A protein has these predicted regions:
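Loop-to-transmembrane helix boundary motifs in multi-pass membrane proteins
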Residues: 42, 203-207, 291-295, 299, ...
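Helix-loop-helix junctions that connect adjacent transmembrane segments
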Residues: 22-23, 29-37, 70, 81-82, ...
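Membrane-interface "cap" regions at the ends of multi-pass membrane proteins
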Residues: 1-63, 67-78, 82, 92-93, ...
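C-terminal membrane-solvent junction of multi-pass transporters and transport-like membrane proteins
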Residues: 198-201, 213, 260, 389-401, ...
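A generic transmembrane alpha-helix motif of multi-pass inner-membrane proteins
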Residues: 425-426, 430-431, 460-530
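Extracellular loop-to-transmembrane helix junctions
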Residues: 58-180, 187-188, 307, 485, ...
Length: 530
């Protein structure tokens, strides 16, 4: 009987612990006491937002969204790509409004992780942090490799600057040693040395850009924002060049039929374009570094989405007006649609500038992704889930330098060891999960803490958060129904996160609580002795 009682008590205490909610006032007090330097204004936030959103998607994915994939697994929207972009924008705006409410109410580092801790408890917060690491850290690695691909493609117009083994992604990551050896055999002109029969190559451009971005972030968010601003200006200028130059050669007959594959093609296009909008959520992780988060963050988040949507719609109109997307299209259009169209118009110089624009776009995305990853981990360190050493700020730059370098060096390891096709698929699930959690958290905190000041409130709640949950949940279900192994790997990733929490995060938090309790007891003893 006693054993049964102790078991019930243990279970009750365990459940109480893992559902422990951290009061938002406590979060704000911690941020005020030992927070990051406040350097970001509304213009900086819009620059970071546009920099994070407009990346490789508009330069590459838009071709597949318009014409469909080469293997026929994804239908194209055709000229109705404009409608697909607006649908994707609405799907994002519901979640963006929820992020804005939280970011103004609890303007501290951590984003969705912090909001979950304030509403759903410790274990849920850990799991969201674990999922966000998948989204930001793995996304950072994947974008670095994409940057390398664009860089090598850009150099191909000149003399070979780098030997193949220093510019080729590690071929052993394809599947196995046999597949890697076959790649080398099928490409005899690409000289890649071998060691014990295994091809040896290092993606040097990806590694170097990761180290460069890390150094810039260590110097501070203000310097990072300046660089992001330059990159945003370059890519917007290149996109404007494409729109203006291409508009004179648009053939209206290419817009007929408007939706060659009907609603199915429009929604398939919206699903692909959705990922060209991802990045606005990273702004919420920088809330602690905003000068006036209550006013500036909603403008930054919503403003960057509106600007991006306008840019995307203009590109879609010109692109589908230049190329007939109702039937088969060249493979070059699917890989680099904007550059292909400029080449077909005999504007090779413009195609070269578009390549530069894609590099600039990816560079700004890298900046925001690594910054977001470090701010999530910084918040988790503050909550004693990981080592408190990562809380230490650089004495000169007031940035989490040790944490930033740790993320950067782990990214280098990931570039050499991860199968990025699978990793990128997993990132999509991480994104959907974090969006859904934030929408749910808004509804919960409206009930549990209705009197808390909300400088920005989600309009038409609870309808807006519910629509965000439905849109993201529907896209997540749609994605899981596609033939891909990542749908099975995501629950495995969550399982690993739960195990690490139980064996490390949970234990470390309890040890810290005991330490704080002992310190309080000792303090009371000293006060009594006085």
């Amino acid at each position: 009987m006693a054993e049964k009682f102790h078991r019930a008590t243990f279970t009750r205490n365990f459940l109480k612990t893992i559902t422990r909610i951290k009061n938002p006032d406590e979060m704000l007090a911690e941020a005020k006491a030992e927070g990051l330097e406040k350097t970001l204004g509304v213009f900086d936030l819009i620059i970071l937002g546009v920099g994070a959103i407009i990346g490789s998607g508009i330069f590459a994915v838009v071709g597949i969204a318009a014409a469909g994939s080469a293997d026929g697994s994804s239908l194209g929207a055709g000229p109705a790509l404009v409608i697909s972009m607006i649908i994707a924008a609405f799907a994002c705006i519901f979640s963006a409004l929820c992020y804005s409410e939280f970011a103004t109410m609890i303007p501290v580092a951590g984003g969705a992780y912090t909001y979950t801790f304030a509403t759903l408890g410790e274990f849920a917060a850990w799991m969201v942090g674990w999922v966000l690491m998948l989204e930001y850290a793995i996304g950072f690695i994947a974008v670095a490799c994409a940057w390398s691909n664009h860089f090598v493609q850009f150099l191909s117009g000149f003399e070979h600057v780098l030997p193949a083994w220093l510019a080729h992604p590690p071929v052993w990551l394809v599947n196995d040693a046999f597949s890697a050896a076959k790649i080398v055999a099928d490409n005899p002109s690409v000289h890649i040395p071998t060691l014990f029969g295994m091809p040896i190559c290092i993606n040097l451009p990806a590694i170097l850009i990761v180290l460069l971005i890390t150094m810039i972030l260590v110097k501070g968010t203000k310097d990072s924002t300046k660089m992001a601003g330059v990159m945003v200006f370059i890519k917007l200028a290149v996109i404007a060049l494409f729109v203006v130059a291409g508009a004179f050669f648009v053939r209206p007959e290419n817009w007929t039929p408007f939706a060659p594959h009907g609603a199915a093609g429009i929604f398939a296009g919206a699903f692909l374009i959705f990922f060209a909008y991802i990045g606005f959520d990273a702004l919420a992780t920088a809330a602690e570094e905003c000068k006036n988060p209550q006013k500036d963050l909603p403008i930054g988040i919503i403003g960057s989405l509106i600007i991006t949507t306008i840019v995307y719609v203009l590109v879609a109109l010109v692109l589908t007006g230049l190329q007939d997307t109702s039937g088969a299209v060249p493979m070059a259009f699917l890989k680099a649609p904007m550059a292909y169209c400029m080449t077909m118009l005999k504007m090779n110089w413009a195609a070269g500038l578009i390549s530069i624009g894609s590099l600039a776009g990816l560079t700004s995305v890298l900046l925001v992704l690594e910054m977001a990853a470090t701010r999530i981990l910084y918040a988790m360190s503050r909550d004693h889930f990981i080592s408190q050493r990562f809380q230490k700020l650089h004495p000169k730059f007031h940035t989490p330098a040790l944490l930033t370098w740790t993320v950067g060096l782990l990214a280098v390891v990931g570039i050499l060891t991860l199968n990025l096709d699978v990793a990128a698929e997993l990132c999509n699930y991480g994104t959907f999960t974090s969006f859904i959690i934030v929408c749910v958290a808004v509804l919960i905190l409206r009930k549990t803490d209705p009197d808390r000041p909300r400088p920005f409130k989600v309009p038409f709640s609870p309808v807006t958060p519910a629509l965000g949950i439905i849109c993201c949940g529907g896209l997540m279900i749609y994605k899981s129904m596609q033939p891909s192994g990542s749908a099975l790997l995501f629950p495995v990733w969550l399982g690993f996160g739960a195990i690490i929490y139980l064996l490390y995060g949970f234990v470390k938090n309890r040890l810290n609580e005991n330490k704080i309790h002992i310190e309080k007891v000792e303090q009371k003893k000293q006060e009594m002795m006085k």
